[in-house]
Each structure stands twice: as C-alpha cells, then as structure tokens.
Amino acid sequence: MDLLLLLFSAIWYILPAYVANAVPCILGGGRPVDLGKNFFDGNRIIGNGVTYRGTFFGILFGIITGILQHFIVILYMDPQSVFNYGLTGYIILGFLLGTGALFGDMLGSFIKRRLKLNQGQSAPLLDQMTFIVFALIFAYPLYQQPVNLMVILLVISPIIHFSSNIIAYKLHLKKVWW
C-alpha cells in the first residue's frame, strides 16, 4: 500500500473519533460528568470541561460520521479502495470510535487533575494521544487494523490535533490555542 493511500485510509478509518472529540467543544456545556465532585486528593475528578451534553453529542456525531462515510463509499468511492463495512458496520464503528475517543479524553482530564493541571492547561501528548489510543482500543475487538495504519495514526494525530485546535481558537470556539 503506498504511503498516500495508507494516510488516507488511516484518516478515513479514525474520522468518527476526530469528529466525536471535536463536537463537545461546539455543542458541549451543561452538567459535568463528575457532577462537580472531588477525588480523594481534593481536586475535581474530571472537571467542568467534560459534560453529559458534550459526551452525548460527541458520540452521536461519531455515529453520524460513520453513517455519512457509508454513503460516501457507496456513492463516490470504489468500495475496494477503502474500508467497506456496510451501514451497520459503520454505525457500530462510529459508536466505538466516538465512545473510545471521549473515554480517552475523560481519562486524560482525570490524569491532568491528578497532576494538578487546571482545565485548559496544556499537557503535551496527553491532550493529543489519549483520545486516539482509546478510540483504537475500543474499536480493535471488531475492527482490527494493520500495525502500519495504527502507527500512522499515532504519528499524525498530534499534528492534526494541534492544527484543529489552532483553527478552533481562531474561530473563537476554544479559549486557548492548544
């Protein structure tokens, strides 16, 4: 598989996770999933940045992304050139990648609170990698991918995450550029 096709395949596969991770920034807010409670160390369990509404819409848009991918494959692409899981498969993949991404983001927030980092403070690699690693873990039992595809995702994800955060900051969707 040539590098360009591998890169496209990697982004195509993980797209529901990227969308699920971005949507809470736009549609989140409301009640935090930790209900404002503190952990044993006296700091918030997760913080105000991870909410029920953001989690719900993140997972929902991960599923919607999977559905859209299915129809794009059918209408515009050679089904042999990309992953062709069928509608049900794309719905399940969107759910697993979206849920995994948001669980990874929650875990990242939990770790940041243990490190006494406030919401919005930068934690290089932790901010960029937990969502992608857990998206891959959640989807892996049903959707195993070649090692080279997963390595590409781990390499490009910090770059994509950084770039998308700068765009969100410029659009006033985020308070900080990281």
Swiss-Prot record:
The answer on whether this UniProt entry bears the keyword Ligase reads: no
Q: Which GO terms describe its molecular function?
A: CDP-2,3-bis-(O-geranylgeranyl)-sn-glycerol synthase activity
Query: What's the domain of life for this entry?
Result: Archaea
Catalysed reactions listed for this entry: 2,3-bis-O-(geranylgeranyl)-sn-glycerol 1-phosphate + CTP + H(+) = CDP-2,3-bis-O-(geranylgeranyl)-sn-glycerol + diphosphate
One Pfam family, short name please?
CarS-like
What is the protein's known function?
Catalyzes the formation of CDP-2,3-bis-(O-geranylgeranyl)-sn-glycerol (CDP-archaeol) from 2,3-bis-(O-geranylgeranyl)-sn-glycerol 1-phosphate (DGGGP) and CTP. This reaction is the third ether-bond-formation step in the biosynthesis of archaeal membrane lipids.
- Annotated protein name in UniProt: CDP-archaeol synthase
Species source reads Methanococcus maripaludis (strain C7 / ATCC BAA-1331)
> What gene does the UniProt entry assign to this protein?
carS
